[in-house]
Curated annotation (Swiss-Prot):
Any one of the GO BP annotations: translation
SUPFAM superfamilies to which the protein is assigned, alphabetical: Ribosomal protein L16p/L10e
Family recorded in the similarity comment: Belongs to the universal ribosomal protein uL16 family.
Signal peptide: none
Function in brief: Binds 23S rRNA and is also seen to make contacts with the A and possibly P site tRNAs.
Top-level lineage group: Bacteria
PANTHER family registered for this protein in UniProt: 50S/60S RIBOSOMAL PROTEIN L16, LARGE RIBOSOMAL SUBUNIT PROTEIN UL16M
Name the record gives this protein: Large ribosomal subunit protein uL16
Quaternary state and interactors: Part of the 50S ribosomal subunit.
InterPro entries: Ribosomal_uL16 (IPR047873), Ribosomal_uL16_bact-type (IPR000114), Ribosomal_uL16_CS (IPR020798), Ribosomal_uL16_dom (IPR016180), Ribosomal_uL16_sf (IPR036920)
UniProt GO MF annotations: rRNA binding; structural constituent of ribosome; tRNA binding
Alphabetical UniProt keywords: Ribonucleoprotein, Ribosomal protein, RNA-binding, rRNA-binding, tRNA-binding
Biased composition (Basic residues): 1-19
Length: 144
């Protein structure tokens, strides 16, 4: 699972979930990508589950890039505990995903395989998403 090596502060405020993604909106490494169309928190477990679903379908072919990272801790108090008495313990790590953000990128496989692999990954995630190509978004090309 993904989590930061070290953090300056153990607990944070809840992040904003309004607006569109400011960065990471283009397919930069691969040929195809999975782009979020709604806002949500994605946990490190959900990212790992989606990655496994994609790589199993592609069977050692192609390359996968994970374009999101869970930097933000989220806390939870134990069950049947009264309100107050401080903030709860860190339960896990989340990545805040807003519309337009590229979640995963794939290269080295045919379009049909990439489309199906990203579709399987999208079923593991709490956001609605769509399949995009590098040419459609105007991403940089690797040609000199």
């Amino acid at each position: 699972m993904l989590l930061p090596k070290r953090v300056k502060y153990r607990r944070q405020h809840r992040p904003k979930t309004t607006g569109r993604s400011k960065g990471g909106n283009y397919v930069t490494f691969g040929e195809y990508g999975l782009q979020a169309t709604t806002t949500s928190w994605i946990t490190s477990r959900q990212i790992e589950s989606a990655r496994i679903a994609m790589t199993r379908y592609m069977k050692r072919g192609g390359k996968v890039w994970i374009k999101i990272f869970p930097h933000t801790p989220y806390t939870k108090k134990p069950l049947e505990v009264r309100m107050g008495a401080g903030k709860g313990a860190v339960e896990g790590w989340i990545a805040v995903v807003k519309p337009g953000r590229i979640l995963f990128e794939v290269a080295g496989v045919p379009e049909e395989v990439a489309r199906e692999a990203l579709r399987l990954a999208s079923h593991k995630l709490p956001v609605k998403s769509k399949f995009v190509k590098r040419e459609e978004l105007g991403g940089e090309t690797n040609e000199s």
